[in-house]
Amino acid sequence: MIELKDIVVKFGDFEALHNINVNVKEGEFFTFLGPSGCGKTTTLRTITGFIEPVSGTVSVNNQDITHVPIEKRNIGIVFQSYALFPTMTVYDNIAFGLKLKKLKKPEIDQKVREIARKVDLSDEQLKKAVSQLSGGQQQRVAIARALALKPDILCFDEPTS
């Protein structure tokens, strides 16, 4: 399902990834383990499209997506820092991507409430600003936001931090 072939990523003269090759089959869970600074996050950001490699290809289901924009990849990501909007409500954070896809309000509402229940966020919590939640609750909001878009692939950067 996911194939990285000969991926090279550079930041200036620094080569962060050198000829990375990875194959992950459909249904598999895959973990990158390694010390800080070894390229785990860079690899995830390359898969999701936040970083474009200097060379090599990123393929999903045998389709080259190396130059496909982030919003067209249908890959979700939960960032290490969650990347939530702290002054927005939990509801609006989860609904953010759904609104960008221009779904109708009733459909957004149904999807937000359904996914919130799945990650154990109450209707009362949906009304709160994200900044009012604990770290664990914020992590669940980030997971819900990623799941709301029904991605084919879901990436977690430092999921236990």
Question: Where do the language-model regions lie?
Answer:
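Hydrophobic anchor residue at the start of the ABC signature
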Residues: 143
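Catalytic Walker B motif of ABC-type/P-loop ATPase nucleotide-binding domains
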Residues: 154-157
